[in-house]
């Protein structure tokens, strides 16, 4: 009675703590969390307008498109949307302002290659060619923006200026203005824009905003027959991703519950056993949620979705106890025989998940906290409470039989036949060598996919719209994001100013300016047109510029992506190394025998060789989502290996058959895991689908190695001395 009261009190406390946990949806929590990276990502979103929602109007005539844009704008304002964030024209003011800042601080943005170009630009012939081109560009209709650009940089020293002028004709061919509305050149599409105040990653808040916009879209479409209006942009795609993840998760959870329930009902005739498994895992889940509340207070729902994978690990503990009970006479005997492998497996698995804590990614740390607390809570329930709930009456367990793929092969997996085991060992060695060769040949290829766009889900229509709009938009975009590097470090600013001053050494600025003015006069320009340019040439520059406020960090998108790739790849390598060390050290401490620790560790090492080799051969890569399975597979692999090794040791010491029941519980556990994650192969979201694919490969390799290698390695390495050794 006291134990029931204690359990009720603990559950009540855990439930109250878990209820205080807050949730949010931000997939960037899986990315590095250092301040420099955060600033870079914020800057990237600003420069690339990642929070902008594009409203695409597609109709029969330009006039109907204009009317549709007007009606949409009126309804949007009437519904309470911020009018200042809605526009139907291209906003060039920010672009021009950015250019003016760059031109006013010229040396801070020039690169070594720019100085090589300047050697040919700052000559009488270079002046004449550049100004003749400027005159040609300024004679084009609607060239007002170019006047601002070329008055500050007539020689187009900066690639941004060169791109803006050189792409002007291409932009005219891609877009046109009709009564002040932005349209494609063929006037079949018009565009309006709305800047989300929530950025591109806050999918929960953006979902409400996009629902409001979609309602206005539907109302507008009803007023125009044949009008097609669609939403596009990073916030739209992020919301669609979040919704797709939820739909896929519900599908996977529903299918998993049905299939696992059928499997457990088949294996455990008494519903009481299934309830005990559910109670054990539920207690562990509450422990994980409560620990998240205490440690962080807020968690991504994506973390909890992936955290459901941990159920497959936690279910091992009550499952092993209940399965093994069928082969013993008392609950006490069951605990005596199973407690050691349960605790060893739990400690090594918890240690592997704690390896996630030092990673500089919020979601990874949260997952480590949740998984470690859940597994500890589950094992505590199984050791303290579950034995008192288990029935002393033994009920038969229906065995799960291996499929009849090949009689001798299946029998070999079940039996301890030395001949069959040696044949399987030879197969393992040959395939391991083959996979090793594959990995060596492709050693320079990355096994980590850091391209986040590969994890985005888009409908076919969204993908088509996105590709078309990007193709059109590329004609009008400058390349600030690709070509300029702004650094807040005084040393870098000083170095660039020194480059500028060194380039001018030995050159007569007054003479060069006189040559420039003469060339401008020949082309018919007024003397005061290029005053901003002349001032930038004669100005004295210092490092006392608040450059970090205008460009706080790196604008080089290639460098930013490279940093992401390097950081994530380092995380992957770190996980592999640390998990291996943690598992091996705990195995040594638990078995107190280097030989047994090596026997338990080798199957996991070979499993990873197989996993990486198979993934390399069929073209599957790890990414920021399925990398978490690296820790999970280590945890599951060492659990299975330890149980099989403990069973083999028990048979060696006592002569009593123990492997069959251990293998039976492992097979049942593996089937549950394959069901839990294997159903994700049906998911349409790329990230969740990749979880299913990696799980199918990883679990198959882990179970096969745990099944085959430990008994064989134990038999090979056992001498008379070892037979008498107490473990």
Annotated model-derived regions:
Residues 247-299, 362, 576-618, 682-683:
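Interfacial segments of transmembrane alpha-helices in multi-pass membrane proteins
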Residues 294-295, 307-326, 339, 343-358, ...:
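Transmembrane alpha-helices and their membrane-interface boundaries in multi-pass membrane transporters
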Residues 140-266, 270, 521-584:
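Extracytoplasmic
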Residues 274-320, 596-644, 705-709, 715:
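Hydrophobic transmembrane alpha-helices and their membrane-interface caps
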Residues 278, 328-359, 601, 653-684, ...:
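Pore- and gate-forming transmembrane helices of large, multi-pass membrane proteins
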Residues 67-182, 186-189, 488-537:
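Alpha-helical transmembrane helix bundles of large polytopic membrane transport and channel proteins
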Residues 1-25, 388, 396-450:
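Signature of alpha-helical transmembrane segments and their immediate interfacial
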Residues 417-522:
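Juxtamembrane segments of multi-pass membrane proteins
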């Amino acid at each position: 009675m006291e134990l029931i009261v204690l359990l009720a009190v603990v559950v009540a406390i855990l439930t109250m703590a878990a209820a205080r946990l807050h949730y949010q949806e931000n997939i960037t929590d899986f990315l590095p969390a250092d301040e420099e990276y955060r600033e870079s990502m914020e800057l990237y979103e600003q420069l690339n307008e990642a929070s902008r929602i594009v409203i695409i109007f597609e109709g029969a005539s330009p006039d109907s498109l204009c009317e549709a844009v007007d009606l949409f704008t009126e309804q949007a304002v009437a519904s309470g949307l911020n009018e200042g964030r809605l526009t139907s024209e291209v906003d060039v003011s920010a672009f021009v302002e950015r250019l003016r800042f760059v031109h006013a601080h010229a040396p801070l943005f020039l690169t070594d290659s720019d100085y090589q170009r300047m050697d040919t630009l700052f000559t009488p012939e270079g002046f004449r060619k550049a100004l003749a081109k400027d005159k040609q560009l300024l004679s084009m209709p609607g060239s007002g923006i170019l006047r601002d650009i070329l008055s500050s940089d007539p020689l187009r020293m900066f690639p941004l200026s060169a791109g803006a002028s050189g792409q002007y004709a291409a932009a005219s061919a891609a877009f046109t203005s009709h009564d002040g509305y932005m349209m494609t050149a063929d006037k079949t599409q018009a565009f309006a824009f709305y800047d989300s105040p929530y950025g591109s990653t806050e999918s929960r808040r953006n979902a409400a905003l996009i629902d409001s916009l979609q309602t206005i879209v539907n109302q507008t479409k009803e007023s125009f027959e044949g009008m097609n209006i669609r939403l596009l942009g990073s916030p739209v795609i992020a919301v669609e991703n979040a919704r797709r993840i939820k739909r896929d998760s519900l599908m996977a959870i529903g299918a998993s519950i049905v299939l696992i329930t059928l499997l457990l009902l088949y294996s455990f005739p008494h519903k009481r056993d299934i309830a005990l498994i559910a109670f054990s895992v539920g207690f562990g889940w509450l422990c994980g949620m409560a620990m998240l509340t205490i440690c962080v207070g807020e968690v991504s729902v994506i973390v909890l979705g992936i955290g459901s994978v941990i159920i497959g690990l936690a279910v091992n503990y009550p499952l092993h106890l209940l399965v093994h009970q069928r082969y013993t006479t008392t609950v006490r005997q069951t605990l005596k025989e199973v407690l050691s492998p349960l605790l060893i497996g739990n400690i090594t698995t918890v240690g592997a998940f704690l390896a996630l804590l030092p990673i500089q990614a919020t979601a990874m740390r949260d997952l480590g906290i949740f998984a470690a607390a859940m597994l500890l809570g589950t094992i505590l329930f199984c050791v303290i409470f579950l034995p008192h709930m288990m029935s002393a009456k033994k009920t038969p367990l229906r065995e799960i039989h291996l499929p009849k793929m090949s009689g001798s092969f299946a029998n070999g997996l079940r039996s301890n036949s030395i001949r069959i085991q040696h044949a399987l060992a030879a197969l393992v060695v040959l395939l391991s060598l083959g996979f090793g060769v594959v990995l060596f040949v492709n050693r320079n290829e990355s096994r980590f996919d850091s391209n986040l766009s590969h994890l985005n889900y888009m409908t076919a229509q969204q993908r088509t719209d996105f590709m078309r709009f990007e193709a059109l938009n590329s004609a009008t975009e400058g390349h600030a994001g690709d070509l300029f590097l702004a650094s807040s470090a005084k040393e870098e600013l000083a170095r660039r100013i020194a480059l500028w001053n060194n380039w001018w050494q030995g050159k007569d600025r007054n003479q060069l300016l006189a040559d420039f003015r003469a060339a401008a006069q020949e082309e018919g320009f007024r003397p005061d047109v290029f005053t901003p340019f002349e001032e930038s040439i004669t100005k004295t520059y210092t490092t006392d510029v608040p450059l970090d406020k205008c460009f706080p960090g790196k604008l080089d998108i290639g460098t930013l992506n490279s940093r992401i790739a390097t950081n994530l790849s380092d995380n992957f390598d770190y996980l592999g190394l640390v998990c291996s060390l943690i598992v091996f050290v705990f195995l040594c401490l638990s078995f107190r025998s280097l030989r047994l620790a090596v026997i338990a560790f080798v199957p996991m090492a070979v499993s990873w060789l197989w996993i990486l080799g198979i993934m390399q051969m069929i073209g599957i890569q790890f990414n920021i989502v399925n990398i978490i399975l690296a820790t999970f597979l280590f945890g599951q692999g060492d659990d299975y290996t330890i149980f099989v090794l403990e069973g083999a040791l028990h048979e060696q010491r006592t002569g009593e058959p123990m492997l069959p029941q251990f293998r039976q519980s492992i097979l049942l556990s593996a089937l549950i895991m394959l069901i839990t994650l294997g159903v994700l192969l049906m998911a349409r979201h790329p990230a969740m689908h990749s979880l299913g694919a990696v799980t199918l490969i990883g679990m198959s390799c882990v179970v096969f190695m745990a099944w085959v290698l430990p008994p064989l390695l134990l038999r090979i390495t056992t001498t008379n001395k070892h037979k008498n050794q107490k473990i």
